[in-house]
Amino acid sequence: MTVWNGTKEPFILKIKQKRSRLGSLLRIYKVFLPRNLNEKTLDAIFSNSFFSSDAKVVSMYGGGVLSIGDRCLIHGSIVLERAASKIEIGENSFLGFSSTLNSRKAISIGNNVLIAEQCLIQDHNSHAIDYQTRRNDINLAIARQVGNPKMDKDFSQVIEHPIHIGNDCWIGYRSIILKGVTIGDRSIIAAGSVVTNSLPSDVIAAGNPAKIVKKLN
């Protein structure tokens, strides 16, 4: 497993890979890099896992910790929303096309986990329950678009709790895993499910909200 401790500056990492004339795999980074992060460092971090040309790692405000085990295949996006964010992916795991891991707290994914296409795993609510606070979120988003990127959103009223997905789980197409959820080992989430509560090991869950439909053992 390799671990990256985030820089103090925001960055976006876009990974591309191609074969050289001799057949060896080359890694190409299209990235906005702070000065203290270079391609040699990135190679050391990601050398044991494969990132497709669609993969993206984003540190929105700088910082965060990303751990990725050996023999992983990443097609989607990994987003570290603040310096305290932590995302851990175990060995031999898969993140499908257009799927997103979005963390302000912590997301932990075990070994041999399959996450299908267009899934969302997010450990926070994004916005406050209070409507007036949400109005301000819109104003801030507009301000960033017109040249005030340093205006910070107030996350003090946004609820966040860590997510844990156990070993050998399968998260089906377009499923959503919300804050505070733990999914036990070997469990399966059916396509299109929204998981709002924790689930034990060895079950199949489906629906919105997801409920156990079958026990595997």
Predicted segment positions?
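A generic "structured core" feature
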Residues: 188-194
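Extracellular carbohydrate recognition
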Residues: 181
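Short alpha-helix at the nucleotide-sugar/activated-sugar donor binding site of glycosyltransferases
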Residues: 114, 187-188
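Domain-scale signature associated with acetyltransferase and cell-envelope carbohydrate enzymes
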Residues: 1-129, 134-144, 149-151, 155-168, ...
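Conserved catalytic segment of ABC-fold P-loop ATPases
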Residues: 184-187, 200-202
